[in-house]
Every structure is written in C-alpha cells, then in structure tokens.
Amino acid sequence: MSQNRPAAFNTLRMGEVIREKVQDGITGETRDLQYTQCKIVGNGSFGVVFQTKLSPSNEDAAIKRVLQDKRFKNRELQIMRIVRHPNIVQLKAFYYSNGERKDEVYLNLVQEFVPETVYRASRFFNKMKTTMPILEVKLYIYQLFRALAYIHSQGICHRDIKPQNLLLDPTTGILKLCDFGSAKILVENEPNVSYICSRYYRAPELIFGATNYTTKIDVWSTGCVMAELMLGQPLFPGESGIDQLVEIIKVLGTPTREQIRTMNPNYMEHKFPQIKPHPFNRVLRKADNNAIDLIARLLEYTPTERLGAIDAMVHPFFDDLRNPSTKLPDSRHQTGQVRDLPPLFDFNRHELSIAPQLNHQLVPPHVRPTLAAQGLDIDHFTPMRKEDMLARLD
C-alpha cells in the first residue's frame, strides 16, 4: 500500500513524479504507474478529484480519492470494473493509500480525464443569454441514453444522473457518464434507500420515499436534464422534497390515486391539492413536437409508463443524429470548424441484444455494412441471453 498521504498531492513540486503500485482497472493485474502535476478539479462529501499527467505518456488522467470503509467492499470500484462502454468514463487503474490518521485508508480510482461537463456547457450558453443548440441537446441526451441502456441491461442503476456527472469532450462532442459512487445493482424485492439522487433530478417515487424503485429513476432524471438544457434552468427546482413535489405537480398536475399507488402505495389516502397539468408545449415554448413528445414520455408519474433508455434512443427526436449528412457546428467559436458527429452507432453484441426487435430502428442503414463486417449482421443476429447480460459482483 502506498505511503503517500493525501497531502502529497498538494505539495508536489513541478516535474516531481509519484510512483504507485496499482491494479489494472480491467484485469486487476499489478503494475507500476507514474504521474506528475496534480491539481484539484473537484471535491465533495465523497472525497477529492485530481487532474494528473501520467508519465512517461504525458496522458491526462483523473484520480478520484475516497475514504475506504475497511468493513465493506467499495461498490463504486466493483461496478467501474464491470462497465466498459464508449459513453462511460473508463477506469484505468486503482490503488490504496494511507491517510493522515493511522486508521485511514483511501481508495484511488485512476480514470480517463475528460475536460468539460454538460453543467459547464449549459452555464456557458446561459452567460451568452441563449440556450444550448438543439442538435447538441440531441447529441448529449442520446449518448446518455446509450450509456443508461447498457448499464440498465446489466441491472445497474446509476442513481445520480445530473449535468455535473456528464463529462464532455467539447472538441469531439463525446459524452461520458461518470461518478458511480451512488450506483447499485438493483435486485427485485430487495429494498433500496430512497434518499439518493440530487435534488431537481429526483424521480417522484423517491420523493415519496419508495424503496422498491427501478432503473426508471435514471430515465426521469434524464428527462429533467433534457428539459433543463432546453430551458436554460432546472425544470423542477426546490430546496426540499415537498418543494420539488409542488414544482412537479405544477407541470404534470396532481397524480391520480392509481399513479400514487405505482410510486408508493402508503400515500394513496393522502390528500393533495387538485391542480390541472400545464402542457409541456407551454413550459418549453421553443421545443418542437418531437421534443415535447419525448419529454412527456420520460416525465411520467408511473415508472412503468416511462420509456426505457433503449426505447428513448429510437425516438424520432434523435432522427437528425441518424442522418449521415448531419454535421456538428462549433457553437462556442464564431469561426469554429463544422465537424462530423462522434461515433454513435458503434454498437457491440451486448448493446444489440438489449432489444433486438428495435435494431433496425437503432442502426441507421449507412452503418449496417460496418457492423456486418465486424460479424454483427442485424438481419441474422443471435442476441445474448438476458441473464448473461446481468452484472455479477465478486
């Protein structure tokens, strides 16, 4: 175990190299890792995130350092070692180090570094007194759904979808989901805590204290993020759960007894103020019919009525992305180059097995020859068994 204390990060001299024995993020094999130039780029209740340069490759990396409770396996590490996807931040390696106090042990997750977040991108457009271009909203929300379709098919729920956890490479337009600190494999009939997910993005069943929720809580959060990018501000702000519920009711109207039953039956006899719904086309005045239709299908009170992530991907709102002639303008710089869209359809066998009946909608015709050349012919495709797709922890 490394003797480097957390403070070592703060006292690094220019050019000084730290050497660690680490375990590979995929294989678990022990190897040497060297890095230099650390600066704090994020901190919170979980710990600290540092930006570093790996040596000798000079490649940027992020090290997330969290206090490790020795009594438990770290769920974030277990899940990060299982997930491998182009829209999920990659775990390169991990190692343990001692803290300031005698008993303290820190887990260090060495991850790829991605320079921007959807939150910061949204703030940029706010400062410019405008909203994010709709093509960018489509691009980012589609990639988020692609990441969610993958983890949900494994039985994993992220439980903290918000703009701050969506990393962005502004030069390529690639989005990567990060921070699996709240993620969990949901098992049917096993209770889960309801006090997860950040305010503004919490599904109503969580506000109602449900403990038997599903991966559809991530779908609700994604609907909130999508609406926020189009509005330039959170759709359901509120300092408390009650505040948020009031904001949701102001838009969706009062839930029916049946809808309340699907969220948490304990509240069925509760009397709520009777409020009529406020149509989404009045809330999102600039949005077209496809955007309104998608948001309405994501922000449903009844969890089973919400679209699944894979179903959302084939929604007509994303048709522009499937058009081979669509280009991505540089919305940050007046003189910027128009670019190709990043890879959005480089599906693997696992992804094509999630809902094989949708593959002809999911894979645009111009991409099919490329996939077929890799042995993934969607006309003659044998999907993986659902049970083989589920994640298993050691």
Curated annotation (Swiss-Prot):
Key word Transferase present: yes
The keyword Protein biosynthesis is assigned to this record: no
Main location: cytoplasm
Domain Protein kinase: 35-318
Induction entry: Expression is regulated by MPS1 MAP kinase, particularly under stress conditions.
Keywords: ATP-binding, Cytoplasm, Germination, Kinase, Nucleotide-binding, Serine/threonine-protein kinase, Stress response, Transferase, Virulence
Stated name of the protein: Glycogen synthase kinase 1
Record organism: Pyricularia oryzae (strain 70-15 / ATCC MYA-4617 / FGSC 8958) (Rice blast fungus)
Phylogenetic lineage: Eukaryota, Fungi, Dikarya, Ascomycota, Pezizomycotina
Gene name as annotated: GSK1
